[in-house]
Amino acid sequence: MQTQDIIESKLDKCRKGIYGPPIGKKCIAFIDDLNMPNTETYGAQPPIEILRQYMDHSGWFELKEKTFLKIEDMMYVAAMGPPGGGRTFITPRFLRWFNVISVTEFDNEAMMGIFSSIMKHVFEKNQVPTNIKGQQANAIQATMDIYESALQSLLPTPSKSHYLFNLRDFGRVVMGMCMANTFIMTEQAQFVRLWCHEVMRVFYDRLTDDRDRLWLIELLRERVKTRFGQDFDKICKHLQTDENGDAIGIPQARRLLFGDFEFPDSKRTYEEMKNPDNVIQVCNTYLEEYNSVSKKPMELVLFLFMIEHITRICRVLRSPGGNALLVGVGGSGRQSCTRLAASIMDYTVVEIEISKTYGKT
């Protein structure tokens, strides 16, 4: 019913019993994730069946009066992924109406060309130093290594169903690097740490157990050496909490922070925040400002683990089209972190309250 209502809302009544687009125009209905609807007990997929009815009979039955509505000058363009992983099979009776075009995965050369062009454009626009600009190809190649390794090793399971990676994740690493003010970087180590941070935000933050996290850190260590010619433990030495610390592991890698709010009185620049204690103090200042104007002040004790999540949310909020899904048990501070991060980024949080009168308006 919802599918039918959506399509009918975009059509005009041409004459009695006939609907279509405005005179002289064609209506193209784009249907994304065509094979997403689940099958019912007997194998039917209602959204698919109503679409097929139009293809078979050039219309469907009106829901109230039960009269047949003929639809003219409308065509479908649909997209879908291969069946599996929650995607179902499309019946041959419906599929026969389409010209099927298979869009294969990009090869490595195409991916290198796409993302290298993006990074090159940003670097030239920001007048990045030559020694940093020369690392862009290494960054793209290293990101491709991480992406391909994640596809092969971080496979989805019933307990890790969210271990799904696609080309958008590759792009998020590149876009994250483009957000940074690379024009103020003077050392290659700064650029490599930026790359490590963006890889961790895209891939590491999705991991749910320490075995997978250690696997990714070891992969980072290897790629930093082979692609950038740098020593991972050496360039991240400042993350150690003691002088005789071991190799960089999970506790140290978590201290690699980037953000644009460490210095509130200056222009916001996305850069490394090397002093976690100073970041905690700054966040406490933002918390005081939030409580001074909020009707529901938050009594929070900020500590490093919480700051890590706040910086991650801030990064998502400053990313174009950024959306965050915070997964955790109740009472773990997801809402508090989000409210404080939104305040830091000068956003207002609006919470939808479900009630009996809740509707589209």
Task: Specify the residue positions occupied by each region the protein language model found.
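AAA+/P-loop NTPase substrate/partner-engagement loops
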Residues: 1-14, 22-25, 106, 110, ...
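Walker A/P-loop nucleotide-binding motif
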Residues: 318-337
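Flexible beta-alpha connector loops of hexameric P-loop NTPases
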Residues: 1, 36-45, 101, 300-301, ...
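Conserved AAA+ ATPase "SRH/arginine-finger" region at the nucleotide-binding site
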Residues: 1, 68, 80-82, 99-111, ...
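Conserved nucleotide-binding/hydrolysis micro-motifs of P-loop NTPases
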Residues: 34-37, 76, 81-86, 105-111, ...
